[in-house]
Amino acid sequence: MKVTSSKLIEQKKPVLKQLLDRLLQTYSYASILMTDSKGKQYTISKQGISITENMFVELGYVVKVYDGESYGEYAFSHIDENEIDTIAEEVKNHVMPWAKKLPDDMKVKQYPEIPDEAYHFEKSTDYEVLPEELGDEEIVKRLGAVREKAMAQDEKIVEIKTACVYQIYHKLFLSPNKDMTQNVMWTNGMIMGLIPKGEEMKMAFDSCSGCGGMEILDDMETKIPPLVQKLNDLATSEPITPGEYDCICAPDVTGMIVHEAFGHGVEMDMFVKKRALAEKYIGEYVASPLVTMHDGAAAASETATFFFDDEGTLAQDTVIIDKGILKTGICDAQAAMALGTKPTGNGRREKNSHKAYTRMTNTFFEPGTDKVEDMIASISYGFYLENASSGMEDPKNWGI
């Protein structure tokens, strides 16, 4: 099934089109982004049951205008027909005169007008089980059953925590040549356990995610056996001797490396600021010929899947590294204009009141052809790394 449209967007769209026409009387380019979203997070642990609103939920609008030299933005949370002139005047009188407030010795960087190809569509992602139809009570019951089943696997396990979070968001983007709507739902599931090892407490977790609905609860149950195995392995583990070893990375560790150690380094707004080493290595080998790296909302069906970004650029599948050679970075529209290149559909806002930055979407290495068992057999002594819990980017040095 497809995620349905937002009734609020349908209601507000005629008014927003009037606002766009009003802005275009003054500016050669204007765009409007409307976001309407909802979502919840469910957590079950020894401490109890928690149901909270998803932290990414928002409702709001942002207009962007071009005065022939630079861009300005104005965010607001409500609009009806009698507020159109007020918003237009606010943009004219308080947003676009921003350059006059700069110190005399500070120059304004001139930007061209954003290319505005014609696109008119409404697209939706697929799902099997709608969270609202399943209901809070049943979701909690299912999460509780996963927790109880995991706890029953081994009496040494002292805690199992299960969690599930979803978001359904709708976005409308309007410009002189664009009228695009997207309806997207993503879901994440997590199961975490604790087991004692002497006076220590060891932790392991597993997770699943996707562009879809509460069918993810079925996936969570399949994570119980590997989680219990990890916990038992940790309970009998010994500290390693510090040194250099051959290692094989589980997909979650590989994902952390591709995201932190390299992904942030090819966000091209950092090229504009000369804060990224990657700019100097375009066209050169930066990895093994076995490595091909992608980023893009259209590159996979996952939690960062969408049809257009927050600047109205269509979703893409960007090949960043092709058989070891660094081909390109990822870019928002503003940084692309500064660099004289094309945006890649990576302009993302934390919320409507924040500017769009270059940010990753679905970032990953292409799978190889070797079997894990053969890879392990090829190493005389080493370690299999899994359960990455955190990382830190280093665009200027490519450190890990």
Named regions from a protein language model:
Residues 1-308, 313-316, 322-325, 361, ...:
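Active-site bordering "gate/hinge" segments
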Residues 281-400:
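Dual-mode signal for accessory low-complexity, basic/Gly-rich regions
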